[in-house]
Curated annotation (Swiss-Prot):
Coiled coil: none annotated. It comes from the Eukaryota. One of its GO terms (biological process) is mitotic cytokinesis. This is Uncharacterized protein C4H3.14c. Residues 1-24, 296-345 are annotated as: Disordered. One of its GO terms (cellular component) is cytosol. Residues 304-323 have a biased composition (Acidic residues). Residues 324-345 have a biased composition (Polar residues).
């Protein structure tokens, strides 16, 4: 049942209590009336009937008519009062029965009231639990809403950051393309400048030709040594049964040819190593020049036109100096190699 039903039941119980109290008062009143009638009846019987015949009546042998009428009247009144008393007794019994019924109904209603109070307490506790659960759920929902709001704000910030990074990436790609184009242009200019320097440097051409002649001379020498070894080997085979002196001469010639071949091969190996070292130095110088050109490219992007021209001239002069240094080292190495070959020959 709900709260309204319990309140209605309480009101009905109060009405029953009031009815019981009213009935109690009525019963008490009727009981008092019955007691009064009984007392009056007893008094009348004791006065007129239980008293007996008076002495003057016995002497005369007669009664006054008024006394008989009075007795009859009193008897009638007593009968009437008895009937009234019986009625009152019946009513009293009925009222007692009603009182018992009302008390039973009251007890039932009290039991129902207690049950309703227990149900009300249970419902109240359940409502309180529901309210607490609703408050907790509301708090959790508010926390989720706050987290969702924070995530949405963070998502918006990330979108803005992504857009900014994309714009920066596009700008960086554009700048990179421009730098690549500038680099290609500078490399082309550097190649043209290097070719121009090589073209206008007769000493370098002469050294290259000298190196080619040296290689040809070494090749001819090795070819001659191989042919001499073959020529010396043929009479050795033909004169297997000749004297020991001839064999020793031939063996000595072969040993000398082998030693000469070893010396030439070792010299050529050393010469090739020196040549590779010189070429590595030249490559390093060229790479340094390219790095300086890259630095010049970066510097060109940040400096004014007038300053760029001065720096460009300085870097070109330094590059020419490095190339001249490499060429001079290469020429020195070639000259020393030629001298060594001539001394060995």
């Amino acid at each position: 049942m709900g709260l309204e039903g319990s309140e209605k039941l309480e009101h009905e119980i109060e009405q029953v209590h009031d009815n019981i109290e009213n009935r109690k008062e009525e019963v008490s009143t009727l009981q008092d009336m019955a007691n009064d009638l009984e007392k009056l009846t007893d008094h009348i019987e004791a006065t007129y009937i239980g008293r007996g015949v008076p002495h003057d009546h016995a002497k005369t042998g007669s009664r006054k008519p008024s006394s008989g009428q009075l007795i009859a009247t009193m008897q009638n009144e007593i009968d009437r009062l008895k009937k009234e008393g019986d009625k009152v007794s019946i009513l009293l019994m009925q009222e007692r029965k009603k009182r018992k019924e009302l008390e039973s109904a009251k007890n039932n209603l009290l039991n129902v009231y207690d049950s309703l109070k227990m149900q009300k307490a249970s419902v109240s506790s359940m409502v309180n639990r529901k309210q607490r659960a609703a408050k907790e759920e509301q708090k959790i929902q508010e926390e989720f809403e706050r987290q969702i709001t924070d995530l949405l704000e963070e998502q918006q910030q990330l979108k803005l950051e992504i857009e900014r990074l994309e714009a920066e990436t596009e700008r960086a790609n554009s700048e990179t393309e421009q730098y690549e184009k500038q680099k290609e242009a500078l490399e082309e200019e550097y190649e043209e400048l290097r070719n121009e320097c090589l073209k206008h440097d007769p000493q370098l051409d002469a050294e290259i030709r000298t190196l080619q002649d040296t290689f040809e001379e070494v090749e001819r020498t090795l070819t001659k040594q191989v042919s001499d070894a073959k020529i010396a080997d043929k009479p050795l085979k033909d004169s297997m049964f000749n004297s020991n002196s001839e064999k020793e001469k031939i063996m000595h010639a072969l040993e000398k040819a082998e030693k000469d071949a070893d010396i030439y091969s070792e010299f050529i190996q050393q010469y090739m190593e020196q040549l590779e070292s010189s070429l590595e130095k030249s490559s390093t110088a060229i790479e340094n020049a390219q790095n300086r050109l890259a630095e010049m490219t970066a510097h060109l992007a940040e400096s004014s036109d007038y300053d760029n021209d001065d720096d460009t001239d300085g870097i070109i002069n330094e590059t020419d100096y490095e190339l001249d240094t490499s060429q001079s080292e290469f020429a020195t190495l070639t000259t020393s190699s030629n001298k060594s070959i001539l001394n060995e020959s």
